[in-house]
Amino acid sequence: MAAPRSSAKSAALFAILLIVAAVQAEDCSNAMDKLAPCTSAVGLSSNGVKPSSECCDALKGTSTSCVCKSVRAVISLPAKCNLPALTCSGSR
């Protein structure tokens, strides 16, 4: 009888771990949309433009890992389009 009880405990523990992992997983699917108010501060013609309060609020509400994932996604676009890789040396 000990084996079924142990199996049930293991299954319950596994289910709890799955739930915790799902809760901790970040949803970064709309990170780029959230940061739309920042476009005027990061565009090519944004030399010295101060970010708006909306941009700063959006940035506060977006995790660093989501921002980084978004940047990596943009940088990976040329390869997905069969274009040369981005080289950003000498730029900020």
Curated annotation (Swiss-Prot):
Gene Ontology, cellular component aspect: extracellular region
Stretch forming the signal peptide = 1-25
Cysteine-cysteine disulfides: C28-C66, C38-C55, C56-C81, C68-C88
Q: Which UniProt keywords apply?
A: Disulfide bond, Secreted, Signal
Short name of one Pfam family: LTP_2
**PANTHER family reported in the protein's UniProt record:** PROTEIN YY1
Q: What is this protein called?
A: Male-cone protein 1
Native source organism of the sequence: Pinus radiata (Monterey pine)
